Amino acid sequence: MDFDRNIFEVRQSRRNPFLVAHRGVSGANVPCNSMAAFQIALHQGADVVEIDVTRTKNGKHLVFHPGKEPVFLKSCPIPEMTAAEVSELCLLNADSAPTSYKVPTLEEVLTFLKGRAYINVDKFWTDVEGISRVIRETGVEKQVIVKTYTDEESLDAVAKYAPDFMFMPMVRGKDDVTDTLLARGVNIIGTEVLFSKETDEVISDAYIRAMHEKGLLVWANAIVYDERDVISAYHTDDISLSKDPALGWGWLCDKGVDFIQTDWLFALKNYLENRRKEN
């Protein structure tokens, strides 16, 4: 993949959306956000690998979803531990049994993915300055996609510490920030759209068309991380696998989104390849 090329141009040269591996590809004995999960994501053809970032109490950035310590480590929160203490722990598998996999550092993951896929750094807003520093030190500025909420504090931090990084604000239901950000001097490449209803502005044909006319991309999520938080109007991985992929992944593709984030990368890729042959 040519990371020197404008990502909108890369998307225009493709028929299918970019495939985003949520926390890598995990399951069974392979924990999410582990080096094995990221290796599998590459093997299965991920265009983008999504990672989560947290920080120890002595300031070391690790790849782990904040707040998930009771699930994946059976420990106290990582921000209450030193990096050395975390390094003694093993990630747990789907049956809560310990594995040989450790919590990787942000440097390890970025170095591993360097030159191999786009990298979506989630939880970027928790420490824009510090995470940006690690991104620059590892030399992956051109392949990293960062996202934040649309509060002024987060947007100011992006403008100050990461104005050159590919940036996507997360918008829910409607978009009140894109036009402002275009004039703000940040490298906005599109939006991550969260929508509970098919009638929401951010998934309308008019919105997606207008974004594309501006040279901007639209990121949608098929993942279900909490059934109580509907972020794709039920056009999800779950319905794609349990009923009909046309109701989930196919619907998102037909809307014209440019990224689909999934927990079932291989199945989504296989569906899109077969769909292309049929069309």
Predicted regions and their residues:
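Phosphate-group recognition and catalysis centered on beta-loop-alpha active-site segments
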Residues: 1-279
